[in-house]
């Protein structure tokens, strides 16, 4: 869920977050190592295919590791060029998602003002900034959602009166059970609400 958790104003010396008044949790979005890895791999592979297609058309070797000038342009060079173009489009999308930091943001819980604020970055446009606010007294519980199997899901949700459950954890790689339990218990203790789903 968080890249870091910061507890401000009234930190207790024994690390008890229930004595403080502000809990700020940063949420990691699309700027994860795995996204950088796949964007780099797709860029390299697609560039190779694209340059191989161009090389077979121009009969000029544009690649260091092989000589694609021996390929016949129709159909091999053409198909490699099309694969390269499709791969470069996919790589562009992946790099833009990383640049925009989709899904990144923070969860801010402030007992002094009695407000919570959930902030996430979205796609560019009029709804780029996604902000959800509520009063702490409207929070009913912190819910843990665990689904095992081929596509496991482990997430924390905030159950608020009159609203759908608000997701608090990052999208992508699921958290470990220990980390999920720790963060859920810490948040429930801080807000003074029950922890459901365990």
UniProtKB/Swiss-Prot annotation:
HAMAP family: Ycf4. Residues 1-20 are annotated as: Disordered. The lineage of its organism: Bacteria, Bacillati, Cyanobacteriota, Cyanophyceae, Nostocales. It comes from Nostoc sp. (strain PCC 7120 / SAG 25.82 / UTEX 2576). One of its GO terms (biological process) is photosynthesis. This is Photosystem I assembly protein Ycf4. The chain crosses the membrane at residues 36-58, 78-100. It is found in: Cellular thylakoid membrane. The keyword Transcription regulation does not apply. It is a multi-pass membrane protein. Seems to be required for the assembly of the photosystem I complex. Its main location: membrane. Belongs to the Ycf4 family. It holds the Pfam family Ycf4. Keywords: Membrane, Photosynthesis, Thylakoid, Transmembrane, Transmembrane helix. PANTHER family: PHOTOSYSTEM I ASSEMBLY PROTEIN YCF4, PTHR33288.
């Amino acid at each position: 869920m968080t890249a870091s958790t910061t507890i401000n104003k009234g930190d207790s010396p024994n690390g008890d977050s229930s004595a403080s008044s502000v809990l700020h949790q940063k949420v990691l979005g699309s700027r994860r190592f795995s996204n950088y890895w796949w964007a780099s791999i797709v860029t390299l592979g697609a560039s190779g295919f694209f340059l191989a297609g161009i090389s077979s058309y121009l009969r000029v070797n544009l690649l260091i590791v092989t000589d694609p000038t021996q390929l016949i342009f129709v159909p091999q060079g053409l198909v490699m060029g099309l694969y390269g173009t499709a791969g470069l489009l996919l790589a562009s999308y992946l790099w833009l998602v990383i640049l925009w930091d989709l899904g990144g943001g923070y969860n801010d819980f402030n007992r002094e003002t009695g407000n919570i604020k959930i902030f996430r970055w979205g796609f560019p446009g009029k709804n780029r900034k996604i902000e959800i606010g509520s009063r702490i007294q409207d929070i009913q519980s912190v819910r843990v959602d665990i689904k095992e199997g081929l596509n496991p899901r482990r997430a924390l949700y905030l159950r608020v009166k009159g609203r759908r459950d608000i997701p608090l954890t990052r999208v992508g790689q699921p958290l470990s059970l220990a980390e999920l339990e720790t963060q859920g218990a810490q948040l429930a203790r801080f807000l003074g609400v029950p922890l459901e789903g365990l």
